[in-house]
Amino acid sequence: AVYANIKKFATYIFASNIPEIVPFITFVLFKIPLPLTVMQILAVDLGTDMAPALGLGAEPPEHGVMDKPPRPKNKRLLDVPLLLRAYCFLGPIEAVACMAGFFFIYFQHGWVPGMVMPDSGVIYLTATTMSLAGIVATQIGNVFACRTERESVFKVGFFKNKLVLLGIVSELIIISTLIYTPFLQRIFGLAPIGLKEWGFLFAFTPVLFLMEEGRKWIVRRWWS
């Protein structure tokens, strides 16, 4: 169980690397304002991600784990399936949410492709806030998804791991404190966002979770 939980922890953490990298790639390739700053990345890696990730360490073993043969001694912890799941499936979904949130603010203020995008001021700060909050929103879906590798989370009990739930509450408190505390806004380059913006971002939370549930179903069905 310890080995499996370390893999779940790693998958959860690695997935957020993609929405942290994609904004820099778009900044360089498409000459748009930087959608996510270094300080905002640190807010994720050293702040919002920590408590939910630790909650995964308390995840009970999946059903049937004792029926499986022992893993080879030379089997790596960071294997190809783990990296593919984090970097090629979960991470890209998070990156879509991150960038969608960023452009959502510009579209709200009348921007259309071809126009210059402001790289300072309230519009820009609000847009980068959406990028950060988009990562947090999808990481909530991700921490539920990472509770199992193959089995459906609905089968193991959606709210069974209380530490994961406490981690999510902690994550929401941290991101809310960063976004709505004036002196922290200045440090992290953030601006307040409203219920409509939160609703847009949290629409991606079940999308990621359900897409991962679908992937697990395919794995169970075809690679049992």
Q: Where do the model's predicted regions map?
A:
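Membrane-embedded transport module
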Residues: 1-151
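C-terminal transmembrane module of polytopic membrane proteins
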Residues: 15, 57, 133-224
